[in-house]
Amino acid sequence: MNKKNLTICSFCGRSEKDVEKLIAGPSVYICDYCIKLCSGILDKKPTSTSSSGASTETAPQHPDLQVLTPKEIKKHIDKYVVGQERAKKTIAVAVYNHYKRIRALLNNKHVSYGKSNVLLLGPTGSGKTLIAKTLAKILDVPFTIADATTLTEAGYVGEDVENIVLRLLQAADYDVARAERGIIYIDEIDKIGRTTANVSITRDVSGEGVQQALLKIIEGTTANVPPKGGRKHPNQEYIRVNTENILFIVGGAFVNLDKIIAKRLGKTTIGFSDDLGDFSQKDRDHLLTKVETEDLIAFGMIPEFVGRFNCIVNCEELSLDELVAILTEPTNAIVKQYIELFSEENVKLIFEKEALYAIAKKAKLAKTGARALGMILENLLRDLMFEIPSDPTVEAIRIQEDTILENKAPVIIRRAPEAIA
């Protein structure tokens, strides 16, 4: 059969070779893919009615897209994220401007300002991922997390960047319009920096190439997403997702970036030692507030990639007091969770203040920030959670400082015999 004689779908242009079924009508054809698409549209809530009485599909107005003020956004983040005041304020403004821009576009207003993508710097366990997760929860938008170290450029073994968009689409239950205003958080972004500032002669599969691959979807493009994931191949069906209004937040520890900044500023002018050895954490946090795009380029990020992020902010290492606050203050604080778990067994779990600080000190020594807190508490309470459901005599458990620092057994308070009966 000649190519010009191939029967094609009148709606999408796919040939009979590219589809499973092609249904004929009077001088028109429709493929199975377009039928599924139309079915999805008909399943949605009723739309406007034309003068002839027929129901017509109109552009979505997204009445549920509420734009909170920066203060409202920060207030909500404060319920879950301890510390990082500067980062929370900066991100609140960026997110406000981002969704204000989307609302203006949906209302067919001319918008001259670009996307407010965010780059978060900071050590492991400082709250970067939690801030992104909390934003998605506040705004009630789809959210997904990707690990930059698993991504490769097209043609290499690994994960295509389009699969990140697929995961967002899955989080939106394949509602394309909803996914198109979601949030994607890419962790470990510093790991795809070039090892040197000089352009590599050989291909850098997991570094510069990935940055190049991410450029378009971060800036805004129509991505052809394979609905089942994996590598693309000819004749495969794709779901088209416009990434123009997806908010991208990327984060990384950027180890030694502080030294690059110090070198640019001139170490003798900012009060640091003459050798560019290890700074104190306070010095590092201060230096990272001075970060410029040229520092990130010197670190190994390509200029085009850095240019996609007009909001760059540092998350500081958490202090001892902040780690204690994380244990007890947020709405979903981990100590509150364990207290609730034990109360389900009619047992009162008590943490002395000194014990909380001992846990925080132990977490700080682990060098993984708030992430270590959960592991420490799990190891501490695991045996108790095993025994308590089978022991009705236990009324309360008191966790003291020596329980943490010297591995002494917690104080167990038992009920009077008559209370058990």
Swiss-Prot record:
GO terms for cellular component: HslUV protease complex. Zn(2+) binds at residues 9, 12, 31, 34. Keywords: ATP-binding, Chaperone, Metal-binding, Nucleotide-binding, Zinc. Gene3D superfamilies: 1.10.8.60, ClpX chaperone, C4-type zinc finger domain (6.20.220.10), P-loop containing nucleotide triphosphate hydrolases (3.40.50.300). GO terms for molecular function: ATP binding; ATP hydrolysis activity; ATP-dependent protein folding chaperone; protein dimerization activity; unfolded protein binding; zinc ion binding. GO terms for biological process: cell division; proteolysis involved in protein catabolic process. InterPro entries: AAA+_ATPase, ATP-dep_Clp_protease_ClpX, ATPase_AAA_core, Clp_ATPase_C, Clp_protease_ATP-bd_su_ClpX, ClpX_bact, P-loop_NTPase, Znf_CppX_C4. Component of the ClpX-ClpP complex. Forms a hexameric ring that, in the presence of ATP, binds to fourteen ClpP subunits assembled into a disk-like structure with a central cavity, resembling the structure of eukaryotic proteasomes. Belongs to the ClpX chaperone family. This is ATP-dependent Clp protease ATP-binding subunit ClpX. The gene is clpX.
